[in-house]
């Protein structure tokens, strides 16, 4: 049986340098290879003309460059593109490209499904299958960059920002997420600024501390409720890591970080008559008084079978005004791609559910009980 080839997209620069050293080559060859892979999108070793023929033959014998394929895509009226990415075994994750005047953002997935059970999120209702590999994470950027067009003459890439807000909880896949981020930030990789790579988390506290000890990127936190009682229902990981523990971990992260400029981005999905009253706005402002933040209010994006509705514009406006009275920076997020189910909370993909959550969900949908405000 032939030895399985090494997928070079699974290795950050440290891993590539170790590989070249083991092959009896100079470590700087890793820098050359990364530039071909990530600046120019080249996967054919024969096109890597500043690498000698003998080494190209060695690489072809032992290594490969394999990114997951795009199965299909949909384009929204606002220019947003949702990609279905085939990650093997008949399963797909979803990746969303969001073009704006001053940036082009790619929302990438970190898991096939999600192990958390946030009750308002379509991905969470699908259950969980597995973590994505490094090559499957960076491969989303690589493949979409090919779709959009690498600038092969200049090395300019079509994606300026990456947000890890797709399917899955990134901090439950740190083993693969951290080297993937290393590749995003590396000057020979995708060469993104640490302020242009955002990791979002629902509050896996120990993993947030590990992330802060190893990487400095922008942080977004999914709060969605101003107290533990409601958050236990909406974001069940809160039962293990309550709000005060989560906020303390956020402050520890901010103390180590330059990318966040001293404040975290707080994500708060607006659920009609669930978490959107003015009393809850006051409660949220008091909760965050010791944690510097800017607050993104996200109009809920309904999906089939969801027990929640979207807050009215008037309720969102009143909620926002209360927060601003406390001197907080508040942004009401403009919904993008909702006509193709590409908006926040709508990503579902095609998941073989190891948790059997879909079957459980059918029995539990009518049992969700939250205080109406």
Curated annotation (Swiss-Prot):
**Sorted alphabetically, which keywords does the UniProt record give?**
4Fe-4S, Cytoplasm, Disulfide bond, Iron, Iron-sulfur, Metal-binding, Methyltransferase, rRNA processing, S-adenosyl-L-methionine, Transferase, tRNA processing
Going by the entry's taxonomy, the superkingdom of the source organism is recorded as Bacteria
Task: List residues binding S-adenosyl-L-methionine.
Answer: 168-169, 200, 222-224, 301
Chief site of localization: cytoplasm
Cellular compartments annotated: Cytoplasm
Which cofactors are reported in the record for this sequence? [4Fe-4S] cluster
The UniProt record lists the EC number as: 2.1.1.192
- The UniProt entry annotates the active site at 94 (proton acceptor), 344 (s-methylcysteine intermediate)
Q: Which InterPro entries match?
A: Aldolase_TIM, Methyltransferase_A, RlmN_N, RNA_MTrfase_RlmN, rRNA_lsu_MTrfase_RlmN/Cfr, rSAM
Q: Does the keyword Transferase belong to this entry?
A: yes
Instruction: Report the record's disulfide bonds.
Output: 107-344
Alphabetical list of Pfam families matching this protein: Radical_SAM, RlmN_N
Gene Ontology biological-process entries: rRNA base methylation; tRNA methylation
| Residue span, Radical SAM core domain | 100-339
Manner of cofactor binding, per the entry note: Binds 1 [4Fe-4S] cluster. The cluster is coordinated with 3 cysteines and an exchangeable S-adenosyl-L-methionine.
Q: Where does [4Fe-4S] cluster bind?
A: 114, 118, 121
Q: Which reaction does it catalyse?
A: adenosine(2503) in 23S rRNA + 2 reduced [2Fe-2S]-[ferredoxin] + 2 S-adenosyl-L-methionine = 2-methyladenosine(2503) in 23S rRNA + 5'-deoxyadenosine + L-methionine + 2 oxidized [2Fe-2S]-[ferredoxin] + S-adenosyl-L-homocysteine; adenosine(37) in tRNA + 2 reduced [2Fe-2S]-[ferredoxin] + 2 S-adenosyl-L-methionine = 2-methyladenosine(37) in tRNA + 5'-deoxyadenosine + L-methionine + 2 oxidized [2Fe-2S]-[ferredoxin] + S-adenosyl-L-homocysteine
Q: GO CC terms for this protein?
A: cytoplasm
Which terms does the record give in the GO molecular function aspect?
Answer: 4 iron, 4 sulfur cluster binding; metal ion binding; rRNA (adenine(2503)-C2-)-methyltransferase activity; rRNA binding; tRNA (adenine(37)-C2)-methyltransferase activity; tRNA binding
Which HAMAP family does the record match to this protein?
RNA_methyltr_RlmN
- Recorded family membership: Belongs to the radical SAM superfamily. RlmN family.
Biological role stated in the UniProt entry: Specifically methylates position 2 of adenine 2503 in 23S rRNA and position 2 of adenine 37 in tRNAs. m2A2503 modification seems to play a crucial role in the proofreading step occurring at the peptidyl transferase center and thus would serve to optimize ribosomal fidelity.
Please give the PANTHER family that the UniProt record associates with this protein. 23S RRNA METHYLTRANSFERASE, RADICAL SAM CORE DOMAIN-CONTAINING PROTEIN
Other comments?
Reaction proceeds by a ping-pong mechanism involving intermediate methylation of a conserved cysteine residue.
Name of the protein described by the UniProt record: Dual-specificity RNA methyltransferase RlmN
Q: What organism does the record attribute this protein to? A: Shewanella loihica (strain ATCC BAA-1088 / PV-4)
Upper lineage ranks?
Bacteria, Pseudomonadati, Pseudomonadota, Gammaproteobacteria, Alteromonadales
Q: Which gene encodes it?
A: rlmN
């Amino acid at each position: 049986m032939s030895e399985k080839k090494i997928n070079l997209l699974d290795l950050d620069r440290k891993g590539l340098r170790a590989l070249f050293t083991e092959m009896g080559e100079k470590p700087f060859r890793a820098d050359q290879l990364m530039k071909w892979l990530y600046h120019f999108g080249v996967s054919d070793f024969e096109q890597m003309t500043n690498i000698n023929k003998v080494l190209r033959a060695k690489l072809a014998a032992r290594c490969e460059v394999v990114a997951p394929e795009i199965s299909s895509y949909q384009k929204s009226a606002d220019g947003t593109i949702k990609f279905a990415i085939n990650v093997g075994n008949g399963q797909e994750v979803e990746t969303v490209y969001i073009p704006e005047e001053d940036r082009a953002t790619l929302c990438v997935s970190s898991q096939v499904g999600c192990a958390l059970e946030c009750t308002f999120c379509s991905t969470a209702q699908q259950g969980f299958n597995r973590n994505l590999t490094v090559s499957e994470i960076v491969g989303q950027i690589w493949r979409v960059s090919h779709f959009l067009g690498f600038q092969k003459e200049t090395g300019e890439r079509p994606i300026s920002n990456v947000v890890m807000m797709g399917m899955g909880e990134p901090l439950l896949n740190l083993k693969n997420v951290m080297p993937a981020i290393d590749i995003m930030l590396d000057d020979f990789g995708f060469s993104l600024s640490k302020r242009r790579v955002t990791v979002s988390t629902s509050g896996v506290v120990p993993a947030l501390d590990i992330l802060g000890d190893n990487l400095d990127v922008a942080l977004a936190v999914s709060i969605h409720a101003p107290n533990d009682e409601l958050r236990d229902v909406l974001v069940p990981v809160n039962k293990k890591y309550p709000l005060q523990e989560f906020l303390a971990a956020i402050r520890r992260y901010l103390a180590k970080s330059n990318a966040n400029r001293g404040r975290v981005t707080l994500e708060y999905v607006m659920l009609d008559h669930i978490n959107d009253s003015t009393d809850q706005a006051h409660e949220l402002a008091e909760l965050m008084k010791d944690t510097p933040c800017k607050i993104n209010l996200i109009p809920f994006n309904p999906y089939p079978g969801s027990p929640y509705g979207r807050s009215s514009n008037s309720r969102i406006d009143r909620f926002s005004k209360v927060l601003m009275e406390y001197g907080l920076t508040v942004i009401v997020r403009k919904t993008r791609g909702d006509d193709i189910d590409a908006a926040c909370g709508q990503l579902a993909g095609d998941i073989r559910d190891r948790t059997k959550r879909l079957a459980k969900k059918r029995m539990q949908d009518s049992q969700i009980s939250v205080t109406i405000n």
